[in-house]
Amino acid sequence: MDRKVAVPEDGPPVVSWLPEEGEKLDQEGEDQVKDRGQWTNKMEFVLSVAGEIIGLGNVWRFPYLCYKNGGGAFFIPYFIFFFTCGIPVFFLEVALGQYTSQGSVTAWRKICPLLQGIGLASVVIESYLNIYYIIILAWALFYLFSSFTSELPWTTCTNTWNTEHCMDFLNHSGARTATSSENFTSPVMEFWERRVLGITSGIHDLGALRWELALCLLLAWLICYFCIWKGVKTTGKVVYFTATFPYLMLVILLIRGITLPGAYQGVIYYLKPDLLRLKDPQVWMDAGTQIFFSFAICQGCLTALGSYNKYHNNCYRDSIALCFLNSATSFAAGFVVFSILGFMAQEQGLPISEVAESGPGLAFIAFPKAVTMMPLSQLWSCLFFIMLIFLGLDSQFVCVECLVTASMDMFPSQLRKSGRRELLILAIAVFCYLAGLFLVTEGGMYIFQLFDYYASSGICLLFLAMFEVICISWVYGADRFYDNIEDMIGYRPWPLVKISWLFLTPGLCLATFLFSLSQYTPLKYNNIYVYPPWGYSIGWFLALSSMICVPLFVIITLLKTRGSFKKRLRQLTTPDPSLPQPKQHLYLDGGTSQDCGPSPTKEGLIVGEKETHL
């Protein structure tokens, strides 16, 4: 390989790497990369990642955690984890995908074959997410369709599904006494449990299939399929709408929320700092797990999306911007949620602690109840559930896309052919839909809670995050990875990122992981229903099935490799030689930088080709 310098008439000298005579480029490899596809532009990548990480948790989990854990004081542990775990691991996964141009499994296999189980574990978590996360979209679609009525069906107690215990608060506020309130239920709760879920007495009784929910689930899967069936070329176009539309809805709901009576009191409850809460280790655990949940860390999605970037894309700048965007969205969503909860508390004459909810309880009980108290309630109901649908939709189809990417990179000769991608997505969609039918039975809510509590729990994500940063910083080498990043973006990231990879992130993850185990409490539905022992066994199977991949594949790869233990260990911790190596740049002042070989660009390296921090 020879370095040649050309001096154009109207520009600076250009330095490129060209093959010497007789030296051939790997045409087959180029075709494979070309077939794999890339983002058309940076905005498609940014919006796709934003769509993945900014989801339902920003609206229904973060505001409640902030209120529950000391209001404004919660931001102290939150931002400690944000800078020491969130940004470093987020950037690590995106940079890994961009550097290797591979999905989650093959990226880790190329970096360190011994720890390829990290990628397989993320695929297991992705698979679980694809089965149960989309159920929320089915519920939201059901509520959206139910909102197109002259009167919202969860407003009154005169419907066929209501019981004699139903009490409409708005029309009978003076009829209920303190001694009898426990015997009554609200029309909102009865609509949720009796009309939507048809919930049974426990997981032992799954009951019949809720056909309306099954059809809503089918519609959700059809939308997801056609959003991604042609690869990143279609996904990149769809996210222009799906990732930005929720922000429009959020702004509209924010304006409406802060103009409601009682909104100010709700916001005060949301932000009022209680520094004494920082003494509680649970507050710190909630902050850490929220970072991992909301940043989609250890799910393989960031690696897969980063793998479609151009080699010299400034993924460092993108990662920092996306992390701040995610947290800012969570913060803004808190104003929407608590302004409306404050209004609802004032209307009912209740303390805000009695109306504050998180998770599905906020989306399908608290907020529907709030809109019944507003003028034009059907309009606000439609806007809210449309926002929920779009928040969940792009997270869902990006998650499916990442599973498809991982599969195609693992078996390129079989799957990267004409028409195979569409069939693979169809197979995944059909399988996940059929599996999801168990979650839209009358007892499906109990199964959904098991998936949500165990399959993608904070324990699983913390466990994988520890191995990710240990693999990159201690096995592959933090300095070596910094060299690779410098080769891609043109400069070395802030030293705190490397310090976090080496010490802070694994230390905090380990401490939070151990504390999570010590504070483990078995799942209870609505804090009342206790699962049978076999139900908890299913939950722990869901949790351990991902975590076991890491040690299991360490053992398998060691047993399959020949030679002494030391030789096998050295071989299995050696990166794939096909990975791009940092190259020697010729600078305009005649100096050179330390380097080893060409990077995988199609036209050669040109001075000024990289994005810079400027």
From Swiss-Prot:
Reaction it catalyzes: 4-aminobutanoate(out) + chloride(out) + 3 Na(+)(out) = 4-aminobutanoate(in) + chloride(in) + 3 Na(+)(in); glycine betaine(out) + 2 chloride(out) + 3 Na(+)(out) = glycine betaine(in) + 2 chloride(in) + 3 Na(+)(in)
Transmembrane intervals: 45-65, 73-92, 117-137, 211-229, 238-255, 291-308, 320-341, 374-393, 423-441, 458-478, 499-518, 538-556
Gene Ontology biological-process entries: amino acid transport; gamma-aminobutyric acid transport; glycine betaine transport; neurotransmitter transport; sodium ion transmembrane transport
Covalent S-S links between cysteines: 157-166
Keyword Flavoprotein: no
Domain of life: Eukaryota
UniProt keyword terms in alphabetical order: Cell membrane, Disulfide bond, Glycoprotein, Membrane, Neurotransmitter transport, Symport, Transmembrane, Transmembrane helix, Transport
InterPro entries assigned to the protein according to its UniProt record, in alphabetical order: Na/ntran_symport, Na/ntran_symport_betaine, SNS_sf
UniProt topological domain (Cytoplasmic) ranges: 1-44, 557-614
Tissue-specificity statement: Kidney.
Topological domain spans for side Extracellular: 138-210
Glycosylated residues, chain numbering: 171, 183
Pfam families: SNF (PF00209)
Membrane topology: Multi-pass membrane protein
Disordered, as annotated region: 1-33, 591-614
Residue ranges, compositional bias (Basic and acidic residues): 21-33
A cellular component annotation (GO) from this entry: cell projection
UniProt entry tagged with the keyword Cell membrane: yes
GO MF terms, alphabetically ordered: gamma-aminobutyric acid:sodium:chloride symporter activity
Subcellular location(s) of the protein: Basolateral cell membrane; Cell membrane
Subunit structure: Interacts with LIN7C.
Function field: Transporter that mediates cellular uptake of betaine and GABA in a sodium- and chloride-dependent process. May have a role in regulation of GABAergic transmission in the brain through the reuptake of GABA into presynaptic terminals, as well as in osmotic regulation. Probably also involved in renal and hepatic osmotic regulation.
The family this protein is said to belong to: Belongs to the sodium:neurotransmitter symporter (SNF) (TC 2.A.22) family. SLC6A12 subfamily.
Protein name: Sodium- and chloride-dependent betaine transporter
Native organism: Canis lupus familiaris
Organism placement in taxonomy: Eukaryota, Metazoa, Chordata, Craniata, Vertebrata
